[in-house]
Amino acid sequence: MLDKQTMVTAHNALPGRTTAMSIDDTHFVNGSSLTAAPQSGQQQILIGMGCFWGAERLFWQLDGVISTSVGYSGGFTPNPTYEEVCSGKTGHTEVVRVIFDPERLPLTELLRAFWERHDPTQGMRQGNDRGTQYRSAIYTFSEDQREIAEASKAAYQALLTAQHRPSITTEILPAGAYYFAETYHQQYLAKNPNGYCGLGGTGVCFPPHSTL
């Protein structure tokens, strides 16, 4: 029996399928396209911080975010379903694809929200949500993004260490394939305002007006 908190190997991962999932393309909150590529001057990044319902809402509320969507990344199975991801047999984590304007929302500020609003020290879980699909992750699209992410991780780790907290387990990797989640997961908490939100930070925050 597979331990859902142990990463599956590529050899043992589910085979998936060649056909991509069809989703409604219109963002339920702001009307943007979910599938459009970033336009000139915009950037994208993939963020995993536990259940993607609450994480997506966090980011669509930030000024400077153009669009958000939720999906699966970081694993092996092509075009997985939600049920397959929850089985722990795909290797994917739940992520939010954030398209943002770095002139209005610098990546450092986006990552401030990331570090402060979940617990990045919990390994293959987030709160009561357990499994490799809930691991903390930042998947970057450029070397500049990777360097900023690593620097912000080091800065937040210093704050955690000063308060005798555990080490960060967030994986920071180049972005691989991103597979959109089913339409009912997109902007879930806007469609279901009383729905589940598992976000919960450590209580450790960057000093106000500090730079990462």
Curated annotation (Swiss-Prot):
The keyword 4Fe-4S does not apply. It catalyses: L-methionyl-[protein] + [thioredoxin]-disulfide + H2O = L-methionyl-(S)-S-oxide-[protein] + [thioredoxin]-dithiol; [thioredoxin]-disulfide + L-methionine + H2O = L-methionine (S)-S-oxide + [thioredoxin]-dithiol. It comes from the Bacteria. It holds the Pfam family PMSR. The active site is at 51. GO terms for biological process: cellular response to oxidative stress; protein modification process. The keyword Oxidoreductase applies. One of its GO terms (molecular function) is L-methionine-(S)-S-oxide reductase activity. It is an enzyme of class 1 (oxidoreductase). Its EC number is 1.8.4.11. Keywords: Oxidoreductase. Belongs to the MsrA Met sulfoxide reductase family. Has an important function as a repair enzyme for proteins that have been inactivated by oxidation. Catalyzes the reversible oxidation-reduction of methionine sulfoxide in proteins to methionine. This is Peptide methionine sulfoxide reductase MsrA. The gene is msrA.
